[in-house]
């Protein structure tokens, strides 16, 4: 019986703090690297952001607030 296996992975993206834009060339290089490593097509299914606390409000909110 055949099986379908889905493998998920993630990698970092560079954000220019001045313009608040993603470095597209860095993203494209990472995608090409994964294509070579996995020897198959790669698709971006979802994006998410994991960042340091940027403001006092965010810090307080995540700690339970004050």
UniProtKB/Swiss-Prot annotation:
Describe its function.
Answer: Component of the COP9 signalosome complex (CSN), a complex involved in various cellular and developmental processes such as photomorphogenesis and auxin and jasmonate responses. The CSN complex is an essential regulator of the ubiquitin (Ubl) conjugation pathway by mediating the deneddylation of the cullin subunits of SCF-type E3 ligase complexes, leading to decrease the Ubl ligase activity of SCF. It is involved in repression of photomorphogenesis in darkness by regulating the activity of COP1-containing Ubl ligase complexes.
Q: Which UniProt keywords apply?
A: Cytoplasm, Developmental protein, Nucleus, Phytochrome signaling pathway, Signalosome
Q: What name appears for this protein in its UniProt entry?
A: COP9 signalosome complex subunit 6a
Protein localization? Cytoplasm; Nucleus
Entry annotated with the keyword Nucleus: yes
Similarity section: Belongs to the peptidase M67A family. CSN6 subfamily.
Q: How does it assemble?
A: Component of the CSN complex, probably composed of CSN1, CSN2, CSN3, CSN4, CSN5 (CSN5A or CSN5B), CSN6 (CSN6A or CSN6B), CSN7 and CSN8.
Q: Which gene encodes it?
A: CSN6A
Q: Which GO terms describe its biological process?
A: red, far-red light phototransduction
UniProt source species:
Brassica oleracea
Record's miscellaneous remark:
Although strongly related to metalloprotease proteins, it lacks the JAMM motif that probably constitutes the catalytic center. Its function as protease is therefore unsure.
Q: Which GO terms describe its cellular component?
A: COP9 signalosome; cytoplasm
């Amino acid at each position: 019986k055949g099986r379908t296996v889905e493998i998920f992975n993630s990698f970092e993206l560079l954000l220019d703090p001045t313009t608040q834009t993603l470095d597209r060339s860095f993203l494209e290089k990472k995608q090409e690297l994964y294509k070579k490593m996995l020897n198959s097509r790669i698709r971006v299914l979802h994006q998410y952001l994991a960042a340091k606390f940027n403001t006092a409000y965010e810090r307080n909110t995540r700690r339970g607030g004050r």
